[in-house]
């Protein structure tokens, strides 16, 4: 742990095509072995597929999808008197976005389409329409928090 106080949060630069920090964060989440160029190409091609399929701007569709994926509540383990309780807590805005992007990429990777571009595009389209595995993950997270509402008084 640093002795000089909290470490400053590094800000990402907006991407060149859409001028969005959110897109840059998605590119960074998708990146494997430091190959950012490849990640960028995949994302931009996925956005082209989104544009073809939905007849809307890909950024609008992506932002709607992310809004549908981001969780509001989650559970965190809290040990009280020898027992572990799943305590529901509200998700901070920064973590909300991070989880949304992480789930989007992870569940896109698990899809059955042939290329990553197609997988990502269809996961974004599904999420924008409140369907898909990443939205289901958010629903499951919320259900878990709802089921453990009785332990809400243990939150810290």
Swiss-Prot record:
Signal peptide: none annotated. GO terms for cellular component: small ribosomal subunit. Pfam families: Ribosomal_S7. GO terms for biological process: translation. It comes from the Bacteria. Keywords: Ribonucleoprotein, Ribosomal protein, RNA-binding, rRNA-binding, tRNA-binding. The keyword rRNA-binding applies. HAMAP family: Ribosomal_uS7_B. One of the primary rRNA binding proteins, it binds directly to 16S rRNA where it nucleates assembly of the head domain of the 30S subunit. Is located at the subunit interface close to the decoding center, probably blocks exit of the E-site tRNA. This is Small ribosomal subunit protein uS7. It comes from Bacillus cereus (strain G9842). The gene is rpsG.
């Amino acid at each position: 742990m640093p002795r000089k106080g909290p470490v400053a949060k590094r800000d990402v630069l907006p991407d060149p095509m859409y001028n969005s920090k959110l897109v840059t964060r998605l590119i960074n989440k998708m990146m494997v072995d430091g190959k950012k160029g490849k990640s960028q190409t995949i994302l931009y091609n996925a956005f082209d597929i989104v544009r073809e399929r939905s007849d809307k701007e890909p950024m609008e569709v992506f932002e709607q999808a992310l809004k549908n994926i981001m969780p509001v509540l989650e559970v965190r383990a809290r040990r009280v008197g020898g027992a572990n309780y799943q305590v529901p807590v509200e998700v901070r805005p920064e973590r909300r976005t991070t989880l949304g992007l992480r789930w989007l990429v992870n569940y896109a990777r698990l899809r059955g389409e042939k290329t990553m571009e197609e997988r990502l595009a269809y996961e974004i389209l599904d999420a924008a329409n409140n369907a898909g595995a990443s939205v289901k993950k958010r629903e499951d997270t919320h259900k878990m928090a709802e089921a453990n509402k009785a332990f809400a008084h243990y939150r810290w």
